[in-house]
Amino acid sequence: MDLSIFFAGTAGSIPTPRRGLPALLVRRGGDRILFDCGEGTQRQLVSTVGLTELTEVFLTHFHADHWLGLPGLLKTFDLRGRERPLTIHGPPGLQELLTLALRLAGRVKFELALVELAPGQLLERDGYAIAPFPVAHRGAAFGYVLFEHERPGVFDPEAAVCLGLAPGPEFGRVQHGETIRGVIPSQVMGPPRPGRKLVISGDTTPCAALGVAAHDADLLIHEATFADEERDRAAQTGHSTAAQAAAAARQAQVRMLALTHISSRHPARLLRVEARAGFTNTVTPRDFDTIEIPFRENGEPRLLHWDAGAPEQEPGTGAREQEPSPEQEPGTERSADTVA
């Protein structure tokens, strides 16, 4: 079962020529789950992976850079004749916000459910679950954790034969949890194997809840709006520095840290250097890049660039990332973002 994250938008509060507003598309098997939907998200998708039939949408909070692309996306689905129901999840206030937005943009004909979540609520899905957790931003704001259920351990056919089971259907039945002629599954199966775990911080300043949610995650996608020189401003606006994101990743013992919500004030290269001083396996995805998360026995998460061939292994890191060109465009140096 594949699990990957497509970075549809990685900018901070203002888009740049190279980065669109926040949006992440999580792909697991046939499920397509969108986390946040900044202005322009539908074009980001149309120009790359296509305007997929989304399974669900999750909003982290209601600042405009994280949701303003949603009404247009819903209208496009409607114009294309979507019939499949769609559920949008978010913090309290979701229903009021989107009801008003659709009143202005025009209602849709397909079934649309607006679900306001509470911290700690567990949404069970086929083989995995999603849960919101509170983060420290301005107003109601969530991060999200997506974690897969445990998988059965590795089957030991030699042990099964020694216990009297015959190769064939009996092997299959005991692997599916059935006791066969006194042989119970635990006698022929190794310990359960963990599923994969993805954590999305949303906009936040450092907080304990994120550390708890991110513990032992395969991938932590954490905002990094500011460089360390502006950590005071980060605290004032409810955001994080790259170094603070790295500290969260290190304390939570995650496998990979991906920085996003990149402001035009700071080159991504600088943020990456600051973060790697505290957490080596840090990457800074660009728009349209993908991170694939394999099962742990199959290797480490890896970053794949949209406009490059096979990823290169950087010396001394577990991060499979090619060095991008300098991030800032002419005329954007140290631009004064209004932080949302």
Predicted regions and their residues:
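Active-site neighborhood of phospho(di)ester-bond hydrolases with catalytic His/Asp-centered motifs
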Residues: 35-38, 55-62, 91, 199-204, ...
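Active-site-proximal loop/helix segment associated with metal-binding centers of metalloenzymes
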Residues: 16, 126-213, 219-221
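Conserved beta-strand hairpin/beta-sheet module of binuclear metal-dependent hydrolase folds
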Residues: 1-50, 83-85, 144-146, 153, ...
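Short, basic, low-complexity termini and linkers enriched in Ser/Thr/Gly/Pro
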Residues: 310-323, 331-332, 336
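Metal-dependent catalytic neighborhoods of phosphoester/phosphodiester hydrolases
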Residues: 69-77, 101, 266-276
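Binuclear metal-ion centers of metallo-dependent hydrolases, dominated by the metallo-beta-lactamase
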Residues: 119-120, 207-314, 338-340
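A gly/proline- and charged-residue-enriched helix-loop-helix capping module
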Residues: 93-105, 114-117
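Active-site metal-binding motif and surrounding structural segment of the metallo-beta-lactamase
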Residues: 31, 39-89, 111-116
